[in-house]
Amino acid sequence: MEKDLTRYRNIGIFAHVDAGKTTTTERILKLTGRIHKLGEVHEGESTMDFMEQEAERGITIQSAATSCFWKDHQLNVIDTPGHVDFTIEVYRSLKVLDGGIGVFCGSGGVEPQSETNWRYANDSKVARLIYINKLDRTGADFYRVVKQVETVLGAKPLVMTLPIGTENDFVGVVDILTEKAYIWDDSGDPEKYEITDIPADMVDDVATYREMLIETAVEQDDDLMEKYLEGEEISIDDIKRCIRTGTRKLDFFPTYGGSSFKNKGVQLVLDAVVDYLPNPKEVPPQPEVDLEGEETGNYAIVDPEAPLRALAFKIMDDRFGALTFTRIYSGTLSKGDTILNTATGKTERIGRLVEMHADSREEIESAQAGDIVAIVGMKNVQTGHTLCDPKNPATLEPMVFPDPVISIAIKPKKKGMDEKLGMALSKMVQEDPSFQVETDEESGETIIKGMGELHLDIKMDILKRTHGVEVEMGKPQVAYRESITQQVSDTYVHKKQSGGSGQYAKIDYIVEPGEPGSGFQFESKVTGGNVPREYWPAVQKGFDQSVVKGVLAGYPVVDLKVTLTDGGFHPVDSSAIAFEIAAKAGYRQSLPKAKPQILEPIMAVDVFTPEDHMGDVIGDLNRRRGMIKSQETGPMGVRVKADVPLSEMFGYIGDLRTMTSGRGQFSMVFDHYAPCPTNVAEEVIKEAKERQAAA
């Protein structure tokens, strides 16, 4: 039976850590009848935070998916982490959502991770509501946060509710559209509220905001705009229709206030999910791509009768077994179906399908376009793989994940655990593409790489608790890069004669710095056949394979352009392998002449500190070679933004707590690579040589 997709909403809830996302999701589940006792995050018993590490730390690490119902609509809700080290979870969730709720703290306002998540949501063109939470907190200011959304995020909030009372006296909200006040009692029961007239002292404010709301909404419809300008009354249904259109187009973001912890205001946000966020048929269809990742011009149309197109967006091993969270874009997926994984070229039979509720599940027979479900027991699937109809194959646009910025060498504490460690790590890599594992060729050490200290800390925890492997960790290593600063024209001749046919290849070439972020580029300008065209790819391959190791400290070389200008060949002794060898030797010959340099990762660091500790915090950031970008004083303290080298930030959280008597907070995200100062570069090169000598 075909489902009515107009009654579906695939939504994500995302925010900065501690803005109250998971608590908001708990309230949604309570209100929609999914759970009967509310779990409090600060007590470590939240429904959505179901990994032990999450429950202990009070932060959401994995995006838990759950289905619930509100006003005859099915909501598939994904609760995402707010900590910067887990941004990958937010990114991959946004990839498969149709709409979202951005949760902001009423006192903290637009915080660092809010900005990152907002940018990702813009990139993914996800329609959003804004929910300003924690309005019962000291220092909470709804209007200030609305202004910050405009100035910091460059977004247009469409204010839909106004708070009644501030801080401790916050009791409810006014629905601007219906001009009704929702006032909750102090029992903490979300169902115990009354709908009354607007408080007398708010009548003028509500009228002003209502006029702004209607003016903004009717811009979506020329006929209604004309009626409005002529002084005609616009119906609430017409206004809602316009708000829905503008929300879907990302022209504005309906904005609500409340306190999830105190159970005030969440119902109106749920109503808005149904009223204004798009259903699966209202979002642009997913493009299909070829093997090179280029769009083919075909799209996965949201139709249960169309060929199957689905995206595996998360792999998770839980106590029930391996789960593959999947968004179905077109077609129908049923138990017993055979599907093709376009990434591996292998087919697999679907054993069981389940609809998830945090960490419990309900078996289902089939799922259709628009659904988010979990497949149990798939073998060779990874995040970003396309699952499709084997008779009508196609690949969806894959996910792109950021490179890790930190690495640590690990080894098992107990002997004989190497195999167990290897199996555990391969499973963890499958679940989290931003976590990488490799073996150091020289030392044979196992190296793990991730997005930050907390990211790797959690992985060590998972190894110990889930897989029973305790490890010793080395010192964190920074992912340095190398580049060149000068153009060099050079020639290399590879000649080898050892009886019989020899080897001969001559290349004339230019190595030069590329544009920042351009990676490795190769071009051939050979004319006249001195280097036959069939050997050009071999020259490119030789250089391409060489850039993984720089000449200063063995770090990968970035932003390098090589141009093959001329050369020579021998009709008998020349071969592709000879030209490849020439390119590799040419690389080693020319790079030292091109004034190479070490690049270090620079992090965008965002620090919050009470005002009386601001001097210490800024002085400390300067000592860490930080460049202060801005300082902003708010009611709760000062927010300092700075660019700081990653190598200077290890252990910063402990130092910040000491400086601020435990009241400071910070987050950081990779921003760019920049040349190291000479003294730092010399130290990096020295350490690299010592490591190589010890290996």
From Swiss-Prot:
SMART domains xrefs: EFG_C, EFG_IV
Keyword entries, A-Z: Cytoplasm, Elongation factor, GTP-binding, Nucleotide-binding, Protein biosynthesis
Locations listed in the record: Cytoplasm
Binding-site residues, GTP: 15-22, 79-83, 133-136
Gene3D superfamilies per the UniProt record, alphabetical: 3.30.230.10, 3.30.70.240, Elongation Factor G (Translational Gtpase), domain 3, P-loop containing nucleotide triphosphate hydrolases, Translation factors
Role, per record: Catalyzes the GTP-dependent ribosomal translocation step during translation elongation. During this step, the ribosome changes from the pre-translocational (PRE) to the post-translocational (POST) state as the newly formed A-site-bound peptidyl-tRNA and P-site-bound deacylated tRNA move to the P and E sites, respectively. Catalyzes the coordinated movement of the two tRNA molecules, the mRNA and conformational changes in the ribosome.
NCBIfam families: EF-G, PRK12740.1-5, small_GTP
Name of the protein in question: Elongation factor G 1
Gene transcribed to yield this protein: fusA
